[in-house]
């Protein structure tokens, strides 16, 4: 599907998304372009849902995707506990204007 490539090869795109999800979990807020934020959001929502499950298989799946073991620990111990009663919608996208240089629409992606 050409509309989800983000202008990158598949290996670069996957690495970028993994980096951004890891950063989102560690920092709880990142600034990026709108298109990238929408892609990261869907992955981050799935990671939080896996963490809420909390079993060993879920822990292994999350650890395999995230680059940082500290981020995985935070996801299971802090973030999953925060959203235990919430049935989805763990992230928020807030528009912040346009990037100087190429006028790309910029947003803040944050955990609610």
Swiss-Prot record:
GO biological process, one term: translation
PANTHER family listed in its UniProt record: LARGE RIBOSOMAL SUBUNIT PROTEIN BL17M, RIBOSOMAL PROTEIN L17
Subunit structure: Part of the 50S ribosomal subunit. Contacts protein L32.
Protein's UniProt name: Large ribosomal subunit protein bL17
Gene Ontology, cellular component aspect: cytosolic large ribosomal subunit
Keyword annotations: Ribonucleoprotein, Ribosomal protein
Gene name, Swiss-Prot/TrEMBL: rplQ
Keyword Ribosomal protein: yes
GO molecular function list: structural constituent of ribosome
InterPro entries the UniProt entry points to: Ribosomal_bL17, Ribosomal_bL17_CS, Ribosomal_bL17_sf
Family the UniProt entry places it in: Belongs to the bacterial ribosomal protein bL17 family.
Keyword tRNA processing assigned: no
UniProt-listed NCBIfam families: L17 (TIGR00059)
Xref: HAMAP family: Ribosomal_bL17
Pfam family membership, one: Ribosomal_L17
């Amino acid at each position: 599907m050409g509309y989800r490539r983000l202008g990158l090869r598949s290996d670069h795109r996957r690495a970028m998304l993994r980096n951004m999800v890891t950063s989102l979990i560690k920092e709880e807020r990142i600034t990026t372009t709108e298109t990238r934020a929408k892609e990261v959001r869907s992955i981050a929502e799935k990671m939080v849902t896996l963490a809420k499950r909390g079993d060993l298989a879920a822990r292994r799946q999350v650890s395999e995707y995230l680059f940082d073991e500290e981020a995985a620990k935070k996801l299971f111990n802090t973030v999953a506990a925060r959203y235990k009663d919430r049935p989805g919608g763990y992230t928020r996208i807030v528009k912040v204007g346009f990037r100087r240089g190429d006028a790309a629409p910029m947003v803040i992606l944050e955990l609610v």
